[in-house]
C-alpha cells in the first residue's frame, strides 16, 4: 500500500510449483487513476523467498464501480495468467542452463545500473554484484543467468514494497534480452 493509500501492490502465492519455485500472481491497483487493476504472473523462489515476474501487468477489463467484484476480476485474471506458467517455467529452466562468464555478468550489471537499461535505483548495483559473486545460498553458486536473476531480486528486497514490485516486474524482460555468453 502506498503511503497515501491510493496505490496497492500485492502477491498471491499459488499452490502450483516446480523445482524450488512456486507460481504467484502479482496484483496492482490505483484509486488515484494512475493505473487500473492489473495482474501479472510470477514466481517465488523457495530458498530465499525472492519474487520474479514475467511481463507487464495486464489490465483486468473492469472499471471501478458499485457493481465491481474484486473476486470475479481476480478469478478472470488468474485464469489468464495461468497461460503464462509454462513459458515462465521454460524461461527459468533456460536461465538455469545458461552459463555466464564473470565478464558477461559484470556487463549485465553495468548495463542495468550504469547505462540505466533497467529502471531501478543505482545504489543497488553493489548489492547485486556482491550477491552474484558471493551468493548467500548454495542454489545460486552456479554462474548462471538464474543466479544473476536471483542476485537482482535479492537486492530488490532493500526497496520499499511498491518500488520492489516495479523493479521485479521489469527484470524478466531486461534479462531476457541479454545474449547468451
Show where each model-derived region lies.
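Intrinsically disordered, low-complexity regions enriched in serine/threonine
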Residues: 13-181
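Amphipathic alpha-helical segments
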Residues: 1-2
Amino acid at each position: 500500500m502506498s503511503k497515501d493509500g491510493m496505490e496497492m501492490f500485492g502477491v498471491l502465492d499459488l499452490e502450483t510449483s516446480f523445482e524450488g519455485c512456486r507460481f504467484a500472481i502479482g496484483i496492482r491497483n490505483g484509486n488515484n487513476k494512475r493505473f487500473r487493476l492489473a495482474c501479472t504472473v510470477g514466481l517465488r523462489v523457495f530458498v530465499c523467498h525472492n519474487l520474479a515476474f514475467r511481463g507487464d501487468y495486464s489490465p483486468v477489463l473492469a472499471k471501478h464501480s458499485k457493481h465491481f467484484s474484486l473476486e470475479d476480476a481476480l478469478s478472470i485474471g488468474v485464469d489468464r495468467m495461468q497461460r503464462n506458467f509454462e513459458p515462465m517455467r521454460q524461461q527459468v529452466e533456460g536461465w538455469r542452463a545458461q552459463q555466464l562468464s564473470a565478464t558477461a555478468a559484470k556487463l549485465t550489471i553495468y548495463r542495468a545500473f550504469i547505462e540505466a537499461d533497467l529502471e531501478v535505483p543505482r545504489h543497488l548495483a553493489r548489492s547485486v554484484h556482491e550477491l552474484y559473486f558471493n551468493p548467500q545460498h548454495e542454489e545460486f553458486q552456479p554462474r548462471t543467468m538464474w543466479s544473476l536473476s536471483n542476485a537482482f531480486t535479492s537486492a530488490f528486497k532493500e526497496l520499499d514494497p511498491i518500488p520492489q514490485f516495479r523493479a521485479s516486474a521489469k527484470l524478466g524482460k531486461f534479462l531476457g534480452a541479454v545474449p547468451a555468453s
